[in-house]
């Protein structure tokens, strides 16, 4: 593989699988910590103490989105939706908690920003070929993206 060579579909799929597993496991652990260690009452109290509005609703919601969204991301199941959900939790965390800590300081935006960027990448790309999404798409006959817009002629041929 050359430094300047365009990656193959397999390489892209492998890279997306690595990204999904690392991001998903990270969210499973963070959501699991909220659900099973702190508990929903602890999460609600912590969110209220940080001044997050609607802590009784938002705290448990974040815990569930992180935990179950992480599982979905690892499996590559409804990946774009799951990544959108965990990405939204990171936007909230950055704005409500981490931004005032700066970038490098403990509790700063560095880590949640990296998680947000990873989630956005999955929203944009989808899960890749090594995923439940790919299996489902193949079974229901969703055509693979070609990297270019479909022409009117191609669309007409497919419709017949």
Where do the language-model regions lie?
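Membrane-interface interhelical connector segments
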Residues: 36-54
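Extended, low-polarity transmembrane helix blocks
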Residues: 1-35, 56-64, 68, 75-160
